[in-house]
Amino acid sequence: MPQASYSENSSIKFESKEIINASKQDLLSLRGNIISMVFQEPMTSLNPYHKVGNQITESVLLHSKVSKKEAKDEALNLMKLVEIDDVERRFNSYPHELSGGQRQRIMIAMALVNKPKLLIADEPTTALDVTIQAQILDLMSKLKEELGMSILFITHDLGLVREFSDQVCVMQNGHIVEKGNTDDVFKNPEHSYTQKLLNAEPQPKLDINTEEIPLIKIENVDVFYDMPS
């Protein structure tokens, strides 16, 4: 890692093994093979000059000793795994020809090339609308169970944390100030910062009493537009 990205007291461990100052060979064995990452905005991660299928195929060839045909077949299988529709056609699409949700699915497919133990998802749904957010979260939950991997989900959206996470860590100024079972932390937050975050959540609107007498009632209203002759 670049020296400016951490202090002398920094430590990053995975399975009890220190990653900071690890050799290049050790890092290469980790990246993609054991730990993969999905970023917030897929358009900044995908190469706009190459078809998405070729980009997945390249990842397969980089990490596996297989033929180009086998790599393409694996890329198509990965696209099916992340529930891309019409994979044969989408394989030959450029990033700008896909929707935001489809591009994020492509990024997830690339991250899963080597079936990693840990998938780091950094705000993976922030750039998506609410409906697509739910689809991507459902997909990630499904893949987590099918592949037996862990997901480190980084987000500022408390609603997503409550819905998606089993365990939660609350960070303030780069330090973990509270961690525990998601339900426990949300129901009984102990740290003042966690309490402030939860208190800042928008409260749902009150139910409207539809049984009260309406102030005004209009029926059988028609609108007509004169068309020029």
Task: Locate predicted features.
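Short, glycine/charged-rich "phosphate-handling" switch motifs in NTP-dependent
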Residues: Q167, K179
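Conserved ABC ATPase signature
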Residues: S93-L98, Q102
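Conserved ABC transporter NBD signature motif
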Residues: Y6-E18
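A short, proline-enriched helix->beta-strand linker immediately N-terminal to the Walker B motif
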Residues: V113-K117
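Conserved ABC ATPase "signature" region
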Residues: E18, E70-R89
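A short, surface-exposed alpha-helical micro-motif characterized by mixed small hydrophobic
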Residues: V161-E163
